[in-house]
């Protein structure tokens, strides 16, 4: 099947129920005939899509923010960061992609601006991207974890410092990835 049809088929149950939705790209998404920009256009053509291509000057496609509004006063009550963790590393590095320095700087700018707009307090934030951070391995290997791990954490061989930036930003309560399946 062509990539556009696959996207439409995957999202169809959500669209049929008229549920607002958003997505981040995975490392396999643009391995076919369509680029990430093309796939973003497919996403945005579907009903109730909240995905955005994001700033043109940032690495990747699909770096965007979804603000969650308070029902009482329309103030931003929480925030979702969606980031493109790329596909694969450069040939010299090998392995999987990572959040790039310009994306990290963008996140920190956005976190600082949101904190300032919220009276100096951070908003509660969740971050979504595809490829896990190297720190996922460290947590599993060095700390008490519950659950099952039936394969290795497939993270980049390079640590871009995004986890440290999340700590510096002080707003992200959790990160969610989909790479290991």
PLM features: what roles do these ranges have?
Residues 5-120:
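Extended active-site neighborhood of metal-dependent phosphoesterases/phosphodiesterases
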């Amino acid at each position: 099947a062509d990539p556009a049809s696959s996207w439409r088929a995957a999202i169809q149950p959500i669209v049929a129920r008229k549920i607002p939705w958003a997505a981040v790209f995975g490392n396999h998404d643009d391995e076919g005939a369509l680029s990430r920009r093309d796939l973003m256009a497919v996403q945005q053509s579907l009903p109730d899509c909240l995905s955005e291509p994001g700033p043109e000057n940032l690495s990747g496609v699909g770096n965007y923010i979804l603000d969650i509004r308070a029902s009482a006063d329309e103030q931003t009550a929480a925030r979702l960061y969606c980031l493109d963790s790329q596909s694969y590393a450069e040939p010299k590095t090998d392995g999987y992609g990572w959040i790039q320095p310009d994306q990290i700087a963008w996140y920190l700018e956005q976190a600082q601006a949101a904190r300032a707009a919220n009276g100096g307090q951070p908003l509660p934030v969740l971050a979504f991207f595809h490829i896990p951070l190297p720190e996922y391995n460290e947590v599993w290997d060095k700390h008490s974890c519950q659950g099952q791990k039936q394969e290795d954490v497939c993270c980049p061989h390079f640590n871009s410092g995004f986890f440290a930036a999340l700590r510096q930003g002080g707003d992200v309560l959790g990160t969610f990835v989909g790479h290991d399946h």
